[in-house]
Amino acid sequence: MPKPNSITLKRIFYDNSHWQGYIGMREIDPDVIQQVESMMKCGDYPEQVKYYICPKCETREKRAFRCKTRICTHCGKQFADAWAIKMERDLYQVIHRHMIFTIPSSIWPFMDEHRHLWKTMLDTVYQVLQEMMSKTGWDEVIPGVICIFHPFGKDLKFNPHVHALVTEGGLKKDMMTEWVHMTYFPYEILRKKWQYLFLKNLRKATKDTLTHWTIEEPCFDKYRNGFYVRARDRVWNAKELGGYVVRYVRHPAIAESRLIGYDGNYVTFYYERMDDSDKDGQRVEVTLPVMEFIDKIVNLIPPKGFKMIRHYGLYSRNQKGKVKEIMCGLHFYCRKKEEKLNALMNIVWKTLCPKCGEEMIPEEQYCPT
C-alpha cells in the first residue's frame, strides 16, 4: 500500500477505491486492467517479496517484486535509464536532428479510436524523409532514422505524435563506404509531405471513402502549409541524445514530482509548455477530478504488443551488423564503448549486494561451497 501522506499514482488509484469505481463504470481491456493492478501492487511488502543472497559475502536481502509496466513511475524510470544507455550504445557518433511530427487535434479522436493506425504514423515519417531527400538531391543517400511514437502531451491529453532521430547525412547507396553530410532540412517540404503522405496512407489503411471527406479534405483545406513539424534541435553526441530523448519520450506518463495537489476528489499537476511561441517553457498547473485524471492515465497505455520504437535505414535491424562494421571503419562507431555500455546496462537490472557490490542471486539458487 502507498504511504498515506505522499502523492503517488498508487495512492490516487487505491484511495477511496477509486480504481474499483472506475472499472465498474467502463468496459476496459483485460491487459490494461492487468497493467494497472500490477502497478498498484508494485513494490508492496510483504506480499510481493523475493529473497536474495550474495554468493561472496553471504549478505541476505529482501527485494520487492517490480511490475515492469510502462504506467509505473518507478519501473518506467528504470526502463528510461536502461533505454538511455541503450541509445548511447546503438547510436552512431554523428550529429542527429531531433524532429517532432504532429497532426491536428481534429484527428486525435479518430487515432484514439483506431489504435492499429499508430504504426501508419511511424512508417509515414520515414517515407517523408526519403521523399524529402529525393526532392533535395540526396536520393542516393541512406540516413539512419529511429522513430518513437508518443501518444500523449505533457498535459496528459491524448496527442499522438512521432519523435524522430535523424542522422544529418548518411551512407551512399552504391558503395556504402562514404559518409555524406546533410545539414539542410527544408521545413516547407517536410510539412507538406508529412500532411500529404499521412492523409494518403490513412485513407489507404482504413479503405474508407468516408475518411476522405471527413478528415482528408478538411485538413487540406484548413492546413495549406502542411502539418506542423519541429526540426530545429541538433544533438551533437550519442550520450546527450540518449538523455535528451528519454526526457521527452521514454519516461512514464507523469513523474510523481509533478503531482502537487490531491485532496481525495481532485488531482493537481503541472507541466512546462514546449512550442515555438513566446510561452515556451512556461509552467502550467492543471486541476482535474480524480476520475478524469485516472481516465487520462489509463487511456495512455498502448495496445498489447505494439512497438513504440521502430528503426529505419542505417538503424534498421536487418542492416545493423553490416552498417556497424562500416561505421567503425569511418570512426563513427566504437566497439570498446559498446562493450562498456553493455556492462553498464546490465547493472541497471541486476540486484547488487549493498556491502560488496557483487551480483546477488535468488536464495533458492544458492549452493554454499
Language-model-derived ranges and their functions:
Residues 1-369:
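Beta->alpha loop/short-helix hinge microenvironment recognizer with preference
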